[in-house]
């Protein structure tokens, strides 16, 4: 029985936005605003946590910095947001009827039941960060991160090759 209760958790975790370019299920977008200076956005879907969204934005920053030969990078500013939308859930109505007859007499009864329906809120996290290439020692108190360290740790955490 415990195995079956894990199935929904496994299915939901498999549906979180993967590390990918922006598409229907979310992903990253980046723009180089000037040499070594980028604006990066990462948008999740309805089952992607804010933590994952923020870490994937950092992962994208580290990928860009690696491709530009930067030892470290600095996060200059960031903005987190949650987009909430509503989905109408399907409603099912079932009617059961019984007819009883005896001689010239008949009677009937019917029961109608309605299930489901209503609205479900869906929350989609998004983060946008501005980062710049900086060749300095890592100092998290100044939002300066080691490019290789961040890249390796986040790829290991999320099992990305």
Task: Please place each PLM-identified region on the residue numbering.
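Secreted/extracellular ectodomain signature
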Residues: 16-161
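C-terminal motif of bacterial Sec signal peptides marking the signal peptidase cleavage site
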Residues: 11-14
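Sec-dependent signal peptide recognition
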Residues: 1-9
